[in-house]
């Protein structure tokens, strides 16, 4: 497969930036802090800051920035009415989390979004039972937009060696001689269906970038440290060492389904991927999205416009009659022979203390999950 041309990364990290004399302060929540860091290190290229009003409305309505560049998820900085009343367009404000300054924003816009419209357009629902919608509604009501400078990095104590910036993953891929790299996004332990599609993709490209999300997720999702250990044992025992790279994606999960699939692809392009795996119900939750909505949405962009090629995979399963993993494209047997795998099912089994069978997960992975 041919490589896709790399885009230049935005770089907004400056630890020497002088914040003295800036009196305005904006308190960040954990969600905004992870967004700030990704803006600073180029993970959200082409964004240079939290969306101003024009870009916000354009992204919500058309999945593009005001200049036409593809971008599907609004990266917003919410503030309370009290905080907003002290801020002025044209001024700078320190971005503070738990009394530490992590950055500065140059304020271009202060605006009140219609969150119902945002929910319907971005999440395709206004239902407050949807975790992404609930999170958005619970955050403050006014948005502040403008370019940022990241002045302090977040200190990640857990699995620190797996936090690798886009500029460094690009270098690592180049050093490995990978011209084509496929990215895989997950918030679940890797089960046999994931392994099947990852290895199918790996047949056609030089390298696999396993990039699990370790930012904020919903209650009930398996903790990141347990997941990381499960990835380590899987890669060690079942993947070729020179063809796989594992590092984490420090973003919060939005559960925005199709729009988040576009977002995840654009971000992995920044990390150096040329291809991106989109399976069934990517970034979905509950029954809010159709099985392949996250694949269909890519048709809304011209070929080549995203700068990364999506690889679409159908629902895969373990077929007892075939004796291996398969999909509708490769298996002739009826569904009674199929063991349907999903992260939800694995989580449910673990919760009930039931050992997931060999068809679901590798033995080494199951041992880690049961301990966790």
UniProtKB/Swiss-Prot annotation:
Record-linked NCBIfam families: PRK04149.1, sopT
Pathway: Sulfur metabolism; hydrogen sulfide biosynthesis; sulfite from sulfate: step 1/3
Membership in a protein family: Belongs to the sulfate adenylyltransferase family.
Organism of this sequence: Shouchella clausii (strain KSM-K16) (Alkalihalobacillus clausii)
Gene3D superfamilies xrefs: HUPs, Sulfate adenylyltransferase
Gene name in the database record: sat
Protein's name according to its UniProt entry: Sulfate adenylyltransferase
Enzyme class at the top of the EC tree: transferase
Gene Ontology molecular function terms on file: ATP binding; sulfate adenylyltransferase (ATP) activity
Entry's Gene Ontology BP terms: hydrogen sulfide biosynthetic process; sulfate assimilation
Keyword Cell wall biogenesis/degradation: no
Entry EC number(s): 2.7.7.4
Keywords on record: ATP-binding, Nucleotide-binding, Nucleotidyltransferase, Transferase
InterPro entries from the UniProt entry: ATP-Sase_PUA-like_dom, PUA-like_sf, Rossmann-like_a/b/a_fold, SO4_adenylyltransferase_pro, Sulfurylase_cat_dom, Sulphate_adenylyltransferase
